[in-house]
Structure formats: C-alpha cells, structure tokens
Amino acid sequence: MTEAVGGVYPLVDMTGGSSRFPEMEENVLDFWKRDDTFQASIDQRNDAEDYVFYDGPPFANGLPHYGHLLTGYVKDIVPRYQTMRGYRVPRVFGWDTHGLPAELEAEKQLGIKDKGEIESMGLAQFNDYCAKSVLQYTKEWEEYVTRQARWVDFENGYKTMDLTYMESVIWAFKELYDKGLIYQGFRVLPYSWAEHTPLSNQETRLDDSYKMRQDPTLTVTMPITGKIEGTGANEALIGANAIAWTTTPWTLPSNLALAVNPSVTYALVEVAGDGEEGFVGQQLLLARDLVGAYAKELGTDARIISEHPGTELIGLTYEPVFDFFRDHPNAFQILGADYVTTEDGTGIVHQAPAFGEDDMNVCNAADIAPVIPVDMDGKFTSLTPEYEGQLVFDANKDIIRDLKAKGRVFRHQTIEHSYPHSWRSGEPLIYMALPSWFVNVTKIRDRMVETNQDIEWMPAHIRDGQFGKWLEGARDWNISRSRYWGSPIPVWVSDDENYPRVDVYGSLDELEADFGVRPTSLHRPYIDELTRPNPDDPTGKSTMRRVPDVLDVWFDSGSMPFAQVHYPFENKDWFDTHAPADFIVEYIGQTRGWFYLLHVLSVGLFDRPAFKKVVAHGIVLGDDGLKMSKSKGNYPNVTEVFDRDGSDAMRWFLMSSPILRGGNLIVTEKGIREGVRQAQLPMWNAYSFLQLYASKKATWSVDSTDVLDRYILAKLHDLVADVTAALDATDIARACDQVRWFCDALTNWYVRRSRDRFWAGDEAHPEAFNTLYTVLETLTRVAAPLLPMTTEVIWRGLTGERSVHLTDFPSADSFPADADLVRTMDEIRGVCSAASSIRKAHKLRNRLPLPNLTVALPDSGRLADFLSIIRDEVNVKNVDLTSDVDAVGTFEVVVNAKVAGPRLGKDVQRVIKAVKAGNYERVGETVVADGIELQDGEYTERLVAANPDSTAQIDDVDGLVVLDMEVTPELEAEGWAADVIRGLQDARKSSGFEVSDRIQVTLSVPGDKQEWATRHADHIAGEVLATSFEVTQDDLGEDAHEVLKGVTASVARV
C-alpha cells in the first residue's frame, strides 16, 4: 500500500457531490441547457457537409412508450457520431397531427359517438378541437426526449397540420396526378364501419391489425336450374345442388354468382341414408378432392355418381339463396376463376362482388354489376328489408336461421381464425366496394423493387426479404379517407355529370388564381367552401366542388422528407441536393408502413429511394416475454428507471442488445442494471482511480515503453478502429460490444496489473498516469454517442474543456498498433481466466498460492517473456510452458448433422459413427471421416482435457491450462498471511483512516498460528503501512477488529 495524493481531478466537477449516475445526468442536462451545447455542435459545423437524418414524426396525443425510447436512442446516437465525424447534422423534431388517431381522441374527449354528431357540432369546431388535442402531450414529450439525452430542435419543429407542410402535400398529389400515378376507381377496400372510412391494404398488415375471432361458417346448397346457351355447361347436372362454403354468412344476401376452377375435377355425390338429415338422396356437386372433408354429412355409403371438369360447370345457372336481387342482370350463374382452390371449403366459391376483391374481378368480367345493401355504418339497408338496420356481423344469426328454414344449410360450424381489425378502434373490418382515389403503385412497382437495391438495410436480409417481398406484391394505394381532420384531396369536380370537369390543384397560388382568394387554411370546412362556376358548362348552372374526402394520414407521413422544408416552394436546391436521406430508423413493422410509403412517394415523385441507409429494429417486450401491457405491469416504469439507474443505463441496455439487428428484446430491471456494470462503472472506476492517485495533471502521451502501457494503447488503437467501422455501418450493438470488451481489459487487467506503478506516484511513473489519462480521454470520446452523459462528466473532469460532444471522433492512426502484443497479452488474460475457473470450481481462494501452472499452447514460447505476470496474477510459484497440447488433452471432431445432413443424406449417420469411433483424419483445412470429406460448417473441433478436474480450456485458442492444486504447509501459511493483510486493510477502512495514514497494529493470533504470524510479520506490516507490528495471544477486548476467524487486531493511527 502507498500514499494516495489526488486532488487534481476533476478539473470541472459535474457530479454535484453525488456518486449516483442519475443525479450526475441531471447536472449534465442542466449544463447543456445553460450552455446551449446542442446548438453549438451544429453551429461549429456550419461549413461542413450535411448529414441528412429523417426523424419519423410521432403523434403527440399520447404519451411516449418503450418503442419511442428505443428508436429515440438510435436517433440520437447516429447524429452524435456523425457530428463528431465532421458533419453538420440538423435534427428538427416533427409532429404527426392528422388522421384517425387525432379524431378518435377528440371524439373520446368530446363524448361523440358517431359522424352525425360531428356534423351536428360543425366541422370547424370539431377540427379546431383536433388541432388542440394533437398537441396535448407536447410538454411531456419534450421532457421525456430531453431526459433521455436526445438532442433535437423542438423550437423549429414542423407539424403536418401546418399550412406550409400541407401545401407541399397537395403539390405531391398533383405531381403524381400529372404523371398518371393517381386515379379514381371503384374497388373493394378494407372498410372501418366504426370510423366510417376505408383503409389501405398496408394498414391491415400492421402489427395489431389481425386478431383471432370466432365466426360462423356455412356450407349452403345452390340448386342447378339450367344453363346459359352457348356455354360448355353439362346439362346432366341440372337438378343437382352445387354447395358453396363461406366464413361470412352476412354476404349471402348479396350473392350474385358462384365460381369454380376450370382445372379442378368436381364430383357429383349422392348423400347416403346416414348422411345429413334433410339431404338424404340429394345429389351434391363439389370438388372431388374435398369429398372426404364432408364424409360425415355425406354419410357412410355416399357414392360418387360422376366426375366433371370445372369447364362443364361454367355456364350453369342456379336458384338464388335470397330473392332480394333475383332479377339482377346476368346474375346467378357459375363462372370460372383460377383463384379457386381445393385447400378448404368445397371448391365452389360464392360470389358477392361488392364485398370481395376477387369476386369483383370475376363478376366484372361477366358483366355482373355489384349490389351494395350495406351502408356506411356497416348495417343492412332497405334493399334487404328482413335485415335492415342490423350490423352485418349481428345479422349472421338471423341469416343462418332463415337459410336453415329454407333447407339450404348443409353444414353449420364455428371457426376461429385470424381476421383484420381496425388498427385504431379495434373493431372488425369489412371489405366493401367503394369509390376512392388511388396511387397507381403497380405502375411503378418494378422501379420500386429496382431502387430498393440501392438501400443499405440493417438487418441486411430485410432488403430482399420482408421489404423486398412486400414490394414485389405491392398493390395500388387507397389514399381516400371519408373523414374530417386531414390534408384535403385537392380535386374539384363538376356537380353536374352532363358537364364533367376535374381540376387538381398543387399550390396556394393555383387555388388563388382560380377561386380569387388565397386560402389561409387547407383544412375542412374552409377548403370545402372554395367553389366556382364550371368553366365547361355553357349554362353557367353547374359548380366546381371539392371531393369531400381527406388524404390517408400516411400520405402526410410519407411526404415528410420534402414537406418539412416546404418543397418545392422553398429550399428547392437544398432538397434536390440532400436527398435521399443518409439515415432513418424505426421498428421493423414500418416495412409496411412509413418505410414503404416513403419509398412509394419518393420513387413516384423523384424516381429515387427516400433513404440510403435504414435500421429496422425489433420489438420491445415485457419481462414475461409478451407485449408490454400497462394493465399487466410487465415492464419497468421508465421514469423510475431514469431515477434509479439513469438514462445512460437504459440506453446501453437497449443499444447493446440484439434488437437493433431485428430481434426482439425482453426488458427487465436486472438487464438494465447489468448494463451499468458493463461500461459505465468500469469507465467511472478507472477515472476515479486516476483521481485518487494523480498529484498533477497528466498529459496526452502514446510513447510509453512499459509493456502494459503499450498493450492498452494498442488495444485503444483497435477499439477506435473497430467502433469506427461498427458505427459507420450503423451496427450500434457491435460498437457496444467493442467498448464493453475494452473496459474489461482496462479495469480488470491494465489498471489492476499497474497498481504498483500508480501507488508509487506520478513522479516515479509519469508514463502510467499519462497513459491512463490518454486512454480515458479517448475512450470517453469513443463512447460519447453511446453514453453521452457519463462520458461528459468524465471528459470534462479530465480536460476542463467545454464538452466531449464538441470534439472530433478519435482516429485510430493516433495510436500505436501492435497486433502481436495484443494477441499475446489477450492470450495471457485467457490463461489467467482459465486458471481462475479451476480455482473457483475447487473453492480455492485467490490469496492462497499454489505450486504450479502448466500452459499448453501450440506456440506457447510467445508467452515466455510474461511468466512473471502469469505467476503474480494466478498466484502460483511456477509456470511451465509447453507446446505439446496432446499431452494434456485431445482434439475431438463433432459433426453438425443439421448442416451436413441436407448434403450428405443417409451418409451423415455413417460419418457420425466414424467420427465417434475415431475413424477420421484432418486433410488440409477439412476433415475426412470414413472416406467422406466434411465441408466447413459441417463439423466443429473441440479440445477435451485429459484430466478435466485440474484442466481448463483457454478461451478463443486451442490451448489448455493445468493447475497443480497441492497445498503445502508453507503455501498455506503464505495464504493465511495474505488473508490477514486483507482483514487489516478492512480494519483501516472501517476505522476511517486515510489511504496514506501510517498505523500501529497489535495482532492477536491463536497459538497454532503464532509461527505463521512471526514468519510473515514484516511482509504484513509493509503492506498495511504499519510502523509498529506486535503479535500476541492476548484478548484485545471488545473494540478489536475481527481480521479472520480466531484472529483479531487493534489498529491506531500514528
């Protein structure tokens, strides 16, 4: 032990006297606010190249959650890093303000139940309320984002409801329209009757859209009544009953046709005597391959009368299920459709063209117009009087009852299936034919697939996997919403179909030119009030009126890159030269949401991707592995975590996990606290060690010749290079790994192995202090984006300068590289770790010296110059090096059957048996077993100890250590003395002595240990700074300190 001087560091104290990270973080946040450090980080790069980052706008009518927290950390790390790399990185926050989320929240707060109440209130009042409610939690958001040490510009943030933003949105609409990429159509769409609006296909693919639901299924009979002349229908089938299966009985009143597959074989089957009651003797028509699925209903002795290709059914007519539309033109015939399969049902599909996209396509080809007996509330209309006013799902019961009464239900079951629901209200959707405006995505689909190849995805497999496959199947995007609060569809049409005209507007100037007034709002109802006479109507009676729908809120979000800068009305040159963005990040579900629609609009408008690099992270789960739920309480409260462990701890836990590589992550308090131990504490402990022993300011130096200094500086070189490579690739988890491994080498090896030099002081060993200073100053810069507040405290304490976040990221070239030394020293660490594992397994304390350690490595001679380090670290008297690994262990080959099996087939078992029998040899870089060559990855090699009890493998190398654990009386005495020293050090500490205080010691020792105490007295006294050291057997009284069991001591300051 030696004297601790200290007092030089910190040069700037940001701890506020606290040793708790959360309290230090509050001090840092307060400093940043007063200092305006964030703005300074941008201003100092005004002449630098911009790094463009798109921050996906959240809704501010709800509080942030773990998903926002996770994404927010990435959104902070990348800009911080790129700033330190010399770029100017503006970070403007934005708010998503339009759409159903805002309307539903407003309805909830106003107690509104339906659209009728909104219209009674008035659109102006309702939308004004929406405008206020969407910003309800902006203060909480700002506090949350600020507390997580995320630097963003709130003051100049954009809102999608801003007039400038909305003008850019309508510009985009018109630009797409002029390119032939927007059209109006009548198509079957997912429709939310609860919210009175259609949705887009991608909205039904969001995480929460599909839910399990029980629904009735019916198999109904359709009596064949005739054939259409000129078709190839087989008249012999007249009088039979086609049977059709449906999971939506409520669509049967709208049935207008049946569909069969021309390539499928159908069977005419007679129901046997023990078949379904009421159908015995009837002849039923269904796909031959599905006859077995109806074995129970058809009866034991049911027989196939005849078989017919699907082409013989096409053109047959049948008796309608209901009479509502009996006279509908061209209806109630069997049509051909390739989409019909024999995977389930009967192979005959009922067609209700108003409620199924495939049905619509098939019936359109046969000139059968759809009928729509369902209103915007999802209820039946007067077209079906028996069910008028009933919600379609509620009507199932009555429809089934009526069909059974008619004898038309052959089978009635209940199915539990995954069914789409509204992602906002949670109510089940229906599919219904509606007029709508569409982006013609299919027209640019191939180009979208092509430009996706220019995007760098993390994880990489998403490019051609989840995102690429979605692009390949992309469909036209329905952008109409029959709602109130949103960007308007900027289309005006004539209100007289005799004088048709369509005008599309893309700017305030164009609107002002035609309507004579410049809009101050593009929201409803104000935009709806703009009307003018139809220029194409010579009578002057018709009027141009805006179509009532608003745009899908995702059109707003997808317009963010250009709309946030009011393109093309402002910042045109800037945007044209700064797109695509360098980087974006959101969770993986956005491959069908924001990522996708950014890509659609960018390719459609600019023929390029919207972003160059993207991270699609996984999902944060509760501590039970399930979705986070406030009612279940299955996740740590964020505020409590911030108060207890700090934001940096949470940041490290999330960023170092597999979630940034697309995996999911279970959040636990234990995991967060473990994050503190991985990087924050090691860094802080190394800094505190320097604080404790430095008597003067250290200086930057990489010139030390000491082997430990050379090692840690070479490790520092590798750290900077590896973290730079990882963050350049946006592999944040890998960057965290590198920092964690370095911190382990720094504190658990370098500082510990260098303690004697530090205890001797900076006059005796300035190179040690300068090296540690250099390492810490560099390490804090490397880790600054990952632990922004912890590193700020340490870096300012070390340097006294303004902020670590105003510095440049280190260059690996600033440090000496020494790959051989790093490899050798890391092997030594591995040797010591392996030896320690043997001690631990045998419960041999580290202070007990052992006689010998044998190190077996193929090139063990490289360790010869470092035996003293190994001896001291492992606490052995001798270290033997040998290159004869076979003397202490053997290499075994293990076949990876899962990998080798597909290639080797049945020979894989032969190879496994040969390997187990030792019938194999290594040939070059491969293994040959029983004459069969195994390829890389099809096998692994492992080193097995000859005596596992005293042997352990060295990590990451083909080597073993063998520990001699025979304890002699001399070694036991020496270990006892070391234990006494440790006990006396504890006594010094509990007595409140300073590290440098000299003391007097009286040690009371049992008679059998007197000789040990006397033999090692000088050593013990020297270690505990005792100027007087007396050994006795006397009782030292109640105030004595227990040093060991049966050993007490009195200590006094000199």
From Swiss-Prot:
Q: Does the keyword Protein biosynthesis apply?
A: yes
Q: Tell me how this protein assembles.
A: Monomer.
Cellular component terms per the entry's GO annotation = cytoplasm
What Pfam families has UniProt attached to this entry?
A: Anticodon_1, DUF5915, tRNA-synt_1
Q: What does the record give as cofactor? A: Zn(2+)
User: Where is the motif 'HIGH' region annotated in this sequence?
Assistant: 58-68
Q: What is this protein called?
A: Isoleucine--tRNA ligase
Q: Where in the cell is it found?
A: Cytoplasm
Q: Where is this motif: 'KMSKS' region?
A: 627-631
One Gene Ontology term from the biological process aspect of the record:
isoleucyl-tRNA aminoacylation
Keyword line: Aminoacyl-tRNA synthetase, ATP-binding, Cytoplasm, Ligase, Metal-binding, Nucleotide-binding, Protein biosynthesis, Zinc
Give the binding site residues for ATP.
630
Broadest EC class assigned to this enzyme: ligase
The terms under GO molecular function for this entry are: aminoacyl-tRNA deacylase activity; ATP binding; isoleucine-tRNA ligase activity; tRNA binding; zinc ion binding
Tell me the HAMAP family matching this sequence.
Ile_tRNA_synth_type2
At the top level, the lineage of the source is Bacteria
PANTHER family per record: ISOLEUCINE--TRNA LIGASE, CYTOPLASMIC, SOLEUCYL-TRNA SYNTHETASE
**EC numbers for this chain:** 6.1.1.5
Domain note for this entry?
Answer: IleRS has two distinct active sites: one for aminoacylation and one for editing. The misactivated valine is translocated from the active site to the editing site, which sterically excludes the correctly activated isoleucine. The single editing site contains two valyl binding pockets, one specific for each substrate (Val-AMP or Val-tRNA(Ile)).
Q: Sum up the protein's function in the record's words.
A: Catalyzes the attachment of isoleucine to tRNA(Ile). As IleRS can inadvertently accommodate and process structurally similar amino acids such as valine, to avoid such errors it has two additional distinct tRNA(Ile)-dependent editing activities. One activity is designated as 'pretransfer' editing and involves the hydrolysis of activated Val-AMP. The other activity is designated 'posttransfer' editing and involves deacylation of mischarged Val-tRNA(Ile).
Q: Which family does it belong to?
A: Belongs to the class-I aminoacyl-tRNA synthetase family. IleS type 2 subfamily.
- InterPro entries membership: aa-tRNA-synth_I_CS (IPR001412), aa-tRNA-synth_Ia (IPR002300), Anticodon_Ile_ABEc (IPR033709), Ile-tRNA-ligase (IPR002301), Ile-tRNA-ligase_type2 (IPR023586), M/V/L/I-tRNA-synth_anticd-bd (IPR013155), Rossmann-like_a/b/a_fold (IPR014729), tRNAsynth_Ia_anticodon-bd (IPR009080)
Q: Which gene encodes it?
A: ileS
Catalytic reactions of this protein? tRNA(Ile) + L-isoleucine + ATP = L-isoleucyl-tRNA(Ile) + AMP + diphosphate
